[in-house]
Amino acid sequence: MLGDRKRKTGHTVLLITLLILSELFAGCGSQEKAGMSELLPTVREENRLVLYTSHKPEVYQPIVEEFENQTGIYVEIRDGGTTELMEDIQNFGKGTVDVMFGGGAESYNAYQHCFDRYESSASAKLNLPIAEEGGVWTPFSELPLVFIYNSRLVEENAAPKGWKQLLGDEKWKGQLAFADPGSSGTSVTILAAIPQILGEDPKICIPAFASQLDGKLCGGSADVVDSVENGTFRVGITLEETAKKRIAQGAPLAVIYPEDGTCIVPDATSIVSGAPHAANAGMFIDFTVSIPVQRLLQDQMYRRSVRRDLNAASPAEMKIVPFDYGWTAQHQDELMQIWADTQKAEREAADAVE
């Protein structure tokens, strides 16, 4: 079954490890894999795929290994943060990278000049409001933004019910976990979603949001859940699948669907312009939206399928605000500049007090 087989590429990596042990451990594991093609002369060029992914191994490994098993295509992987990988594709990816797998759809729109349009063989089965927005990307899963809180530290009736309360109530000042947008694609999505959900000028609501953080930022998206779980912060903003996964592992967390609405933003997959193995890249994208993979997302990964024939019902308390990809792409630089200016002003104010 999908996800149950051992990763055959792991055997190749193990062989390489035995041959060049010190060099491999000096590197970055899967990040080095994308540069190992010269060490694998037995793999024919037409049977390769170079994959960049911002997914965690528990997401990409079962999918990649089953793709390899079914197609005989060897997948070379480099993983990392969405922004880091997008920048690398922009600067060095043409002619060397085939696929970007993972990261919010709005990131693909911001870097759309780096990708080629591809219509999946399953496009007729995908949620049309998402697929029609696609442009250069194909959706992989639907990811609602949610609040989380530490259920040992915050009573249910005291938890923030919506964005206006989270941004306006002084009791959450300095108690809100949020990752640095410079390293977290999820945080970039959140910054873009807040003005759309509240219907406010970004120059007003983003500084108000930043003020609630009180100068405290988490290093990455995973740190948001960690810091709420361990009590460093009492509440946080994250993706539904991230929260549900941790709760299933026994974390003292609870999920809130904001009463004033939330956005469901898909993560995506796309073919890099100039992909050296473009046909294999198309096969991989088709595989990610196939019924077996999409069922795997729902059954084992706490994610929502993008297929109409597999969609699970949303919670009754979830009020969905459409995410405007065009507006986000047009204003992303402005949003990040507002954020940077706000952070600079807060640092200067803190220095003045000292």
Please place each PLM-identified region on the residue numbering:
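A bilobed periplasmic-binding-protein/Venus flytrap-type ligand-binding module shared by bacterial periplasmic
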Residues: 146-153, 195, 265-280, 296-297
